[in-house]
């Protein structure tokens, strides 16, 4: 936009839009600024959709902002650290089970990155746990990964992820999420509980 002489980029929090007078009020560092406009495009950004289950957000954060990414990074690395300190095999297993919900581009990338971290990057970083034993599970409601991009590309993504050690569950819908894991319902009507300390909603 900097090459557009008639465009202006302004930092601030919009507090009021006056359509009749074609002005926008924004606050920055405690000061309100009024900016006139000829054309106004409102792009508030993307939010996470939990499909009417917003209570899932506490235990399965999304990844739409830098703050979200930092929170997830802390949860993922923290799970390895807690597993290292735990002497309870069941607790370790739960801590080393990472579930990514959603097989779109973000979920595919996230599952691949967690698998890469666990199965390659962190090898030898801990004394009491084998990070290569970490489970990374990717859950998708459709019959293929990357549904909007077609079955061929989805199949290629699935092959790559499986080579990284990602367990892929297709035709699966998450029906509940809590501190200790999540509940998944499959197309055949079966229901399964997955114990996991770290869940990511993508």
Residue ranges with predicted function:
Residues 111:
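Glycine-rich loop/hinge motif
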Residues 7-99, 189, 200:
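FAD-binding core/adjacent interface of flavoenzyme oxidoreductases
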Residues 2, 80, 118, 122:
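Conserved hydrophobic residues forming the short capping helix/wall of the S-adenosyl-L-methionine
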Residues 12-17, 115-202:
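A Rossmann-like FAD-binding core segment of flavoenzymes
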Residues 1-7:
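N-terminal glycine-rich phosphate/pyrophosphate-binding loop and immediately adjacent elements
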Residues 101-104, 142:
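Glycine-rich Rossmann-fold phosphate-binding loop(s) that bind the pyrophosphate
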Residues 107-108:
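N-terminal Rossmann-fold NAD(P) dinucleotide-binding loop
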Residues 1, 33-34, 192-193:
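Structural alpha-helical scaffold elements that stabilize or flank donor/cofactor-binding regions
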């Amino acid at each position: 936009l900097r090459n557009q002489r008639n465009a202006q980029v302004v930092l601030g929090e919009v507090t009021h839009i006056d359509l009749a007078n074609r002005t926008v009020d924004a606050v920055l560092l405690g000061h309100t600024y009024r900016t006139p406009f000829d054309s106004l495009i409102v792009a508030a950004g993307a939010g996470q959709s939990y499909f009417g289950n917003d209570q899932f957000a506490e235990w399965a954060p999304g990844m739409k902002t830098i703050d979200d990414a930092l929170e997830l990074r802390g949860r993922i690395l923290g799970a390895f650290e807690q597993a290292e300190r735990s002497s309870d095999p069941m607790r370790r297993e739960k801590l080393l089970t990472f579930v990514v919900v959603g097989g779109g581009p973000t979920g595919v990338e996230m599952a691949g990155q967690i698998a890469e971290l666990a199965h390659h990057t962190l090898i030898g970083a801990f004394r009491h746990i084998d990070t290569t034993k970490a489970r990374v599970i990717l859950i998708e409601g459709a019959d293929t990964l990357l549904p909007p991009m077609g079955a061929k590309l989805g199949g290629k993504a699935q092959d790559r992820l499986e080579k990284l050690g990602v367990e892929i569950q297709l035709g699966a819908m998450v029906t509940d999420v809590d501190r200790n894991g999540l509940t998944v319902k499959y197309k055949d009507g079966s229901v399964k509980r997955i114990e996991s300390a770290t869940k990511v909603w993508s």
